[in-house]
């Protein structure tokens, strides 16, 4: 069940909010846990025992860690991290590793019978759990003694599908203040966030994404007959689709959290206006970047042990970033691609980028869009080699004119909406209450029309 589906918007959401608001404060966490369990099990209960065991194990393990003697204080969380990572590796990467070993060593190992469907949200809730265990070990937080409260943190349904990856310490105060966390101001902000995110997802992402789908499906032969201009048009469309899909879903997540009384960190901050790759990654998937910084980069020494060690740490972080996104070599290549770009910037380029005005933005957009070409290279019909050939070796083929005629306005709208202009306009509109309510109502109605007319409700980043 995704947030842009009819069943969520017209059944689950209103009923869950109504019940949540009606119960007294002391019962809100229990109700929220029940609602999160229903949400998690909506498409099946096959993986419910898995997440239940993980919640119980990590709840008890953190309590044990806090009481352990100093000699064991570092070993216990390490064991917890290995257990949780082991679960993630088994479900997400085991068959990829087996296939890789078979190709390299020709061993003929049999693939594991674990299916192709990942447990819902496993990449996100495993990282939340690991951050909790590490923070308990380092004394940044005390272990949660209330089992229901801890279970709500792990299962919190607004964050189950695509995050954001919120640390326990960022939610703890509100988890414990169930009587006062729901306020009219927070609910109003949550409704705005949710509708704006829904608009990005169903009006922009899904509509622009149809262009990329049409291009790689042209003639049933993928990119084979696509011209160079059309290949660039397609990868630009995919870049916009991915941004609006993920940023929109993240906004919906934070909007739902605010409706439930929680303030969660933003996951995006206009990444396509960045003037460097370094700045881009401060604006894109902020909570994932922060997680790798806090739990891998800094513990390894960060930039405190010389440039060579810093580059090694960066290599490990970006290899892990690529691997986190999926069990495929194109994701690993994508992560290392950014390692190379960031290394170049840190070594000498960043100081020149800071002096420029226009060219740093062009440079950043070019390499980010090219990066999305690597990212999407496992899609049928768009192998990386063929895509790069189409992009950089001028070729004739299917003209972009037809696609520009059908999608040109959408592409322009997408470019405008990925800038700071919509935020500025909303600030101006918000000064007039009547205008604000009217625009909000119209946008909500338009989103509802798109949702009802849609034939397939998905979220791209739910696959990671």
Regions found by a protein language model. Give the residues of each.
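Membrane-embedded transmembrane alpha-helical bundles that form the catalytic cores
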Residues: 1-463
């Amino acid at each position: 069940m995704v947030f842009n589906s009819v069943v969520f918007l017209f059944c689950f959401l209103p009923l869950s909010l109504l019940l949540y608001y009606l119960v007294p404060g002391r019962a809100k966490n229990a109700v929220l846990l029940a609602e999160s369990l229903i949400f998690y099990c909506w498409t099946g209960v096959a993986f419910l025992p898995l997440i239940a065991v993980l919640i119980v194990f990590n709840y008890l393990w953190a309590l044990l860690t806090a009481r352990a003697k100093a000699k064991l204080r570092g070993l216990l969380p390490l064991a917890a991290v290995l257990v949780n990572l082991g679960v993630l590796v088994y479900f997400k990467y085991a068959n990829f590793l087996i296939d890789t070993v078979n190709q390299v060593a020709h061993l003929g190992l049999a693939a594991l019978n674990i299916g192709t469907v990942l447990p819902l949200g496993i990449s996100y809730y495993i990282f939340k759990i690991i951050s909790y265990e590490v923070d308990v070990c380092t004394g940044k937080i005390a272990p949660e003694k209330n089992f229901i409260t801890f279970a709500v943190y792990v299962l919190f349904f607004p964050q189950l599908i695509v995050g954001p990856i919120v640390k326990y310490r960022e939610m703890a105060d509100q988890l414990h203040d169930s009587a006062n966390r729901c306020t009219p101001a927070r609910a109003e902000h949550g409704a705005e966030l949710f509708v704006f995110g829904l608009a990005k997802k169903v009006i922009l992402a899904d509509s622009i994404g149809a262009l990329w789908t049409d291009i790689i499906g042209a003639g049933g032969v993928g990119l084979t007959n696509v011209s160079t201009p059309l290949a660039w048009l397609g990868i630009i469309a995919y870049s916009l689709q991915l941004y609006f899909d993920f940023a929109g879903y993240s906004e919906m997540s934070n909007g739902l959290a605010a409706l439930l009384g929680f303030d969660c960190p933003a996951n995006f901050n206009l990444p396509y206006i960045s003037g460097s790759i370094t700045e881009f990654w401060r604006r894109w998937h902020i909570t994932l970047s922060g997680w790798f910084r806090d739990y891998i980069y800094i513990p390894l020494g960060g930039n405190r042990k010389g440039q060579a060690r810093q580059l090694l740490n960066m290599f490990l972080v970006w290899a892990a970033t690529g691997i986190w996104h999926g069990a495929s070599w194109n994701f690993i290549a994508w992560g290392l691609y950014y390692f190379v770009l960031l290394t170049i910037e840190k070594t000498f380029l960043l100081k020149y980028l800071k002096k420029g005005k226009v060219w740093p933005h062009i440079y950043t957009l070019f390499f980010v869009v090219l990066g999305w070409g690597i990212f999407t290279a496992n899609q049928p019909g768009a192998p990386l080699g063929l895509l790069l050939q189409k992009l950089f070796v001028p070729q004739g083929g299917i003209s972009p004119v037809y696609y520009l005629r059908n999608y040109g306005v959408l592409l322009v709208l997408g470019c405008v909406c990925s800038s700071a202009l919509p935020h500025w306009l909303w600030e101006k509109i918000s000064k007039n209450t009547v205008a604000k309510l009217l625009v909000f109502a119209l946008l909500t109605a338009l989103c509802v029309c798109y949702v009802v007319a849609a034939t397939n409700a998905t979220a791209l980043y739910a696959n990671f």
